[in-house]
UniProtKB/Swiss-Prot annotation:
Induction: Induced by exposures to biotic stress (e.g. nematode and Botrytis cinerea) and abiotic stress (e.g. salt, genotoxic, wounding, drought and oxidative stress). Repressed by exposures to biotic stress (e.g. Agrobacterium tumefaciens) and abiotic stress (e.g. hypoxia, cycloheximide, 2,4-dichlorophenoxyacetic acid, AgNO(3) and aminoethoxyvinylglycine). Residues 614-633, 726-741 have a biased composition (Polar residues). It comes from the Eukaryota. Forms a corepressor complex with LUG; LUG is the transcription repressor subunit and SEU the specific DNA-binding adapter. Interacts with AGL24-AP1 and SVP-AP1 dimers when complexed to SEU. Interacts with AP1/AGL7 and SEP3/AGL9. Binds to LUH. This is Transcriptional corepressor SEUSS. It comes from Arabidopsis thaliana. Disulfide bonds: none annotated. One of its GO terms (cellular component) is nucleoplasm.
Length: 877
C-alpha cells in the first residue's frame, strides 16, 4: 500500500469542465504522493469507488498542468496512453467501473503546491493531441533503447520496498508535437467514452475488485519467477498497444479482453507465490534422479570412544522394558552387536573341580586372555543373544552390573577398536543372592562402534547372601540351644525327658533351616542359573549344526534330506574331516592286501609251530623248578608283572577283563605296579596262559601289516598245537593292550589316539632294530633289564620269550650261539636260538625287549605324557 504521509503540494492549474471528464461531481479526491514513471501506485477506493492512478508517460506534467480536477470525480474515464518506459504489472490493478479506461488523478513531481482548492485550466484539443503524439513517438524510442534498464530499475525499486530517491520526470522541448498528437487521439477516445452508458457493477464484482487492490508483490526467489515477471510485463505492453490500435471496437469486447487479462495476471501471481514452496522440492527430486546418496561417514576414532560405547551399552541394558519382550532385545542386539558377533565366557581358571557340563570340549576351547589348556567356557553367537538376554532376566536376574578398572584402548590396523580391562567385576543381582565374578574383560568394536567380540575370563566367583536372611535363622538356633541347655541342667527326674526331647528337636529344626538358607539352589557351581546354562547348551548344539543348516539353505532341501546327503565325518575324533572317495578306495585296497597277507602268515605259522616243538621239549626239564621264581619277577629289573604264578593258568578272556578293569578304575594306581625308577608307565603287560592258543613268531611282513592297525589276527590253526608249552604269539601277546585301548577310546578318543601313535612308533622302532640284528623273536609288553646283563643283552636284537635272563656275567646272546653255562645248538636256518642248560628259557609269560637306553628314555617320556593325559581326564563327569 502507498504510504499515507501528506503529498507535496501541486502547482496551480486550470479548471476542467465536468463535461469533458464525463463526471457530475462527487466526493473529494484523496491526495497521493508523487510517483516516478516506472512505478504504479496502489489503488485506493473511496465512497463512490473513485480511484487515483499514475500514468506511465514521462511527460505527464505538461498534460496535468492543463487539466483541472474536481473534488469529486466518480468513475472518471480518461484514457491515458503508455509512455516509452515499461508499465508495471500492477498498473491495471484496481479499476472501478470501466476501469480499463479510467483515468486517475495525475500528480506532477515538479509541483509543490497544495492540491485542495486548486484547479487546472482547460486545454485545447490540439494541445491534447500533440501531447499524445509526442508520447507515442517517445514510446517507440524508449522501448527499443531503455527496456532492459527500466526493468532492472523497477525490480530494484520494488525489492527495496520504498520510493525514496526517485528523481522527477523532466520534459524535453522536442516532445511538444507528440503531445499534440496524443491529445487528438485522447479527445476522440473521450468522446467515445462519453457516449457509453453507465455500467452497473454487481456486489460480487465490487468485492472482487476490492480484493484485487490488496494483492501484494512477493519478492523474487528464483530465476524462474523473474522470467515469469518479464513475460508478464511484455504481455501487458502488447495488450496496451492493442487497446490504442483498436479504437473502433465495442466496449463489450474491450471489457472481455480486460477480464481475460486480469485472469492471466492472477494466475501468474499465484505461480509466483508458489515458487518459493516448490524450490526446496526441486533439489530433492534432482538428487533422487541424478545424484546417488552418499553413504554415512564412518566416525573418526578418538580415544575413549570404546569406553563411552560400553557405558551406553550398560545404560541401555539397565533401562529395559518391564515386560522383557523379545522385540526389545532383538533391537538391542542389532544396535550394539555386529551380525557375526560372539560373546564368550571362559571358566578355565576355575579348575577341574567345578561342574562344566555343557561347555565346549577341552581340546576345542581356546581363550586368548588366559591361554589355559585344557580350557572350558561358553560361547554364544549374535543369533542366540536376544533369547539369551530374555532368559537371563526371566530366570531371576534383577540387574547386571559391571565394575571396571582403567581401560586400555587402542585401534588395530583393520580399524577395530580393542578395549581391555585387566580388572573387571561382573555382578548379577538376584532377589536373595548376589553372584560376583572377578576376571578380565576384552571387547573388540567394529569401525561403526558395534561389538564384534566380547570375552570375559573369570578367575573366580563369590555367592553373597544378605544378612537379613541369616539373622532370624541364627537367632532361632541360638534360642533353641539355650532352651536345651536349661532343660538339661534342670532335668533331675524322668519327667523332664520329654521337654529335653522337644528342645532337641527344636534345635535340630533350627539348624536345618539355617543350612537351607545357606544353600543356593538357584545357580550352579559356575554361578549361572540352570535355564541360562541350558540355553547355552542349546546354542552349542545349534552352532555344531550350523554347517548342516547352511547346507540345507544352500541346497533348499529339508532337514532330513539334508542330513542324509550331508558329507559324514568318520574317525575317532569328530574334529577330523570326512574321507574323500579316493581315500575310501585306498582303504579298501589295503584291506584286501591285509587279508592276503594274513593267509600267508597262517601258512608260515604252521611251519614255525613244528620247529617250536623241539625247543619246548628241551625246556621241559627245568620248567618245574624255576617257574614260580620267575613268575614273581624282581621289580628292579624294570619288568612289569601284572600276575603271579597262580594266574598262569587263567584264560585270555579273564585277562582281558582285568585289563578293562584296570584301565577304567586304576588310572591313578599305576605307581603301585611301576617302580619309582622305571621310566615307563601305563598298562601292565598281560601275558597269555599256557593253555590258550599260541602261535609262532610272525614274519616281518606280518609285523608290517599289524603295526599300523594295532590289531591281532586270529588263526584257526592255533587249536592244532599239541604242546601246552608252546611259545605264545608275539602279535597275540601284543594285542593284550588293544582291548583296553579300544574301550578307553570310547571314553576319550583323542587320548587313545595319542597313545596308539606312541605305541605304533615303539613297534616300528622294534621292527627296524630286530631286522638289523639278524631276525629274532619279538615280544610285546613292558620290558627292562638287570644292570649286570644289560651290556651284553644290548649287543644283539634278541627278545627272550617265556622267561627271564639269569643274573650271570657270562650271559651272551648271539645270532647263532647260546647262553653261557650250557651248550646251545644253533638253528641258523630259521634264525631261532636253541637254548639248553641251566640258563634255558623259563615258562614265564613276559617278553623282554632289548633297546637302546636313549631310545627307551624318549619313549618313556612319551608314554608318561600319554598317561598323564589319561589321569587328567575327569572320569566322573
Amino acid at each position: 500500500m502507498v504510504p499515507s504521509e501528506p503529498p507535496n503540494p501541486v502547482g496551480g492549474g486550470e479548471n476542467v469542465p465536468p463535461s469533458i471528464l464525463g463526471g457530475q461531481g462527487g466526493a473529494p479526491l484523496p491526495s497521493q504522493p508523487a510517483f516516478p514513471s516506472l512505478v504504479s501506485p496502489r489503488t485506493q477506493f473511496g465512497n463512490n469507488m473513485s480511484m487515483s492512478m499514475l500514468g506511465n508517460a514521462p511527460n505527464i506534467s505538461s498534460l496535468l498542468n492543463n487539466q483541472s480536477f474536481v473534488n469529486g470525480i466518480p468513475g472518471s474515464m480518461i484514457s491515458m496512453d503508455t509512455s516509452g518506459a515499461e508499465s508495471d504489472p500492477m498498473s491495471n490493478v484496481g479499476f472501478s467501473g470501466l476501469s480499463s479506461f479510467n483515468a486517475s488523478s495525475m500528480v506532477s513531481p515538479r509541483s509543490s503546491g497544495q492540491v485542495q482548492g486548486q484547479q487546472f485550466s482547460n486545454v485545447s484539443a490540439n494541445q491534447l493531441l500533440a501531447e499524445q503524439q509526442r508520447n507515442k513517438k517517445m514510446e517507440t524510442q524508449s522501448f527499443q533503447h531503455g527496456q532492459q534498464q527500466s526493468m532492472q530499475q523497477q525490480f530494484s525499486t520494488v525489492r527495496g520496498g520504498g520510493l525514496a530517491g526517485v528523481g522527477p520526470v523532466k520534459m524535453e522541448p522536442g516532445q511538444v508535437s507528440n503531445d499534440q498528437q496524443h491529445g487528438q487521439v485522447q479527445q476522440q477516445q473521450q468522446k467515445m467514452l462519453r457516449n457509453l452508458g453507465s455500467v452497473k457493477l454487481e456486489p460480487q464484482q465490487i468485492q472482487a475488485m476490492r480484493n484485487l487492490a490488496q494483492v501484494k508483490m512477493e519478492p523474487q526467489h528464483s530465476e524462474q519467477s523473474l522470467f515469469l515477471q518479464q513475460q508478464q510485463r511484455q504481455q501487458q505492453q502488447q495488450q496496451q498497444q492493442q487497446f490504442l490500435q483498436m479504437p473502433g471496437q465495442s466496449p463489450q469486447a474491450q471489457m472481455n479482453i480486460f477480464q481475460q487479462q486480469r485472469l492471466m495476471q492472477l494466475q501468474q501471481q499465484q505461480l509466483l507465490k508458489s515458487m518459493p514452496q516448490q524450490r526446496p522440492q526441486l533439489p530433492q527430486q534432482f538428487q533422487q534422479q541424478n545424484l546417488p546418496l552418499r553413504p554415512p561417514l564412518k566416525p573418526v576414532y578418538e580415544p575413549g570412544m570404546g569406553a563411552q560405547r560400553l557405558t551406553q551399552y550398560m545404560y541401555r541394558q539397565q533401562h529395559r522394558p518391564e515386560d522383557n519382550n523379545i522385540e526389545f532385545w532383538r533391537k538391542f542386539v542389532a544396535e550394539y552387536f555386529a551380525p557375526n558377533a560372539k560373546k564368550r565366557w571362559c571358566v578355565s581358571m576355575y579348575g577341574s573341580g567345578r561342574q562344566t557340563t555343557g561347555v565346549f570340549p577341552q581340546d576345542v576351547w581356546h581363550c586368548e586372555i588366559c591361554n589355559r589348556k585344557p580350557g572350558r567356557g561358553f560361547e554364544a553367537t549374535a543369533e542366540v543373544l536376544p533369547r539369551l538376554f530374555k532368559i537371563k532376566y526371566e530366570s531371576g536376574t534383577l540387574e547386571e552390573l559391571l565394575y571396571v578398572d582403567m581401560p586400555r584402548e587402542s585401534q588395530n590396523s583393520s580399524g577395530q577398536i580393542v578395549l581391555e580391562y585387566a580388572k573387571a567385576t561382573q555382578e548379577s543381582v538376584f532377589e536373595h543372592l548376589r553372584v560376583v565374578r572377578d576376571g578380565q574383560l576384552r571387547i573388540v568394536f567394529s569401525p561403526d562402534l558395534k561389538i564384534f567380540s566380547w570375552e570375559f575370563c573369570a578367575r573366580r566367583h563369590e555367592e553373597l547372601i544378605p544378612r537379613r536372611l541369616l539373622i532370624p535363622q541364627v537367632s532361632q538356633l541360638g534360642s533353641a540351644a539355650q532352651k536345651y541347655q536349661q532343660a538339661a541342667q534342670n532335668a533331675t527326674t524322668d519327667s523332664a525327658l520329654p521337654e529335653l526331647q522337644n528342645n532337641c528337636n527344636m534345635f535340630v529344626a533350627s539348624a536345618r533351616q539355617l543350612a537351607k538358607a545357606l544353600e543356593v539352589p538357584l545357580v550352579n557351581d559356575l554361578g549361572y542359573t540352570k535355564r541360562y546354562v541350558r540355553c547355552l547348551q542349546i546354542s552349542e548344539v545349534v552352532n555344531s549344526m550350523k554347517d548342516l543348516i547352511d547346507y540345507s539353505r544352500e541346497t533348499r532341501t529339508g532337514p532330513i534330506e539334508s542330513l542324509a546327503k550331508f558329507p559324514r565325518r568318520t574317525g575317532p575324533s569328530s574334529a577330523l574331516p570326512g574321507p574323500s572317495p579316493q581315500q575310501a578306495s585306498d582303504q579298501l585296497r589295503q584291506q584286501q592286501q591285509q587279508q592276503q597277507q594274513q593267509q600267508q602268515q597262517q601258512q608260515q605259522q604252521q611251519q614255525q609251530q613244528q620247529q617250536q616243538q623241539t625247543v619246548s621239549q628241551n625246556t621241559n626239564s627245568d620248567q618245574s623248578s624255576r617257574q614260580v621264581a620267575l613268575m614273581q619277577g624282581n621289580p628292579s629289573n624294570g619288568v612289569n608283572y601284572a600276575f603271579n604264578a597262580a594266574s598262569a593258568s587263567t584264560s585270555t578272556s579273564s585277562i582281558a577283563g582285568l585289563i578293562h578293569q584296570n584301565s577304567m578304575k586304576g588310572r591313578h594306581q599305576n605307581a603301585a605296579y611301576n617302580p619309582p625308577n622305571s621310566p615307563y608307565g601305563g598298562n601292565s603287560v598281560q601275558m597269555q596262559s599256557p593253555s590258550s592258543s599260541g602261535t609262532m613268531v610272525p614274519s616281518s611282513s606280518q609285523q608290517q601289516h599289524n603295526l599300523p592297525t594295532f590289531q591281532s589276527p586270529t588263526s584257526s590253526s592255533n587249536n592244532n598245537n599239541p604242546s601246552q608249552n608252546g611259545i605264545p604269539s608275539v602279535n597275540h601277546m601284543g594285542s593284550t593292550n588293544s582291548p583296553a585301548m579300544q574301550q578307553a577310546g570310547e571314553v576319550d578318543g583323542n587320548e587313545s589316539s595319542s597313545v596308539q601313535k606312541i605305541l605304533n612308533e615303539i613297534l616300528m622302532n622294534n621292527q627296524a632294530h630286530n631286522n638289523s640284528s639278524g631276525g629274532s623273536m619279538v615280544g610285546h609288553g613292558s620290558f627292562g633289564n638287570d644292570g649286570k646283563g644289560q651290556a651284553n643283552v644290548n649287543s644283539s636284537g634278541v627278545l627272550l620269550m617265556n622267561g627271564q635272563v639269569n643274573n650271570n656275567n657270562n650271559t651272551n646272546i648271539g645270532g647263532a650261539g647260546g647262553f653261557g653255562g650250557g651248550i646251545g645248538q644253533s638253528m641258523a636256518a630259521n634264525g631261532i636260538n636253541n637254548i639248553n642248560g641251566n640258563n634255558s628259557l623259563m615258562n614265564g609269560r613276559v617278553g623282554m625287549m632289548v633297546r637302546d637306553p636313549n631310545g627307551q628314555q624318549d619313549l618313556g617320556n612319551q608314554l608318561l605324557g600319554a598317561v598323564n593325559g589319561f589321569n587328567n581326564f575327569d572320569w566322573n563327569a
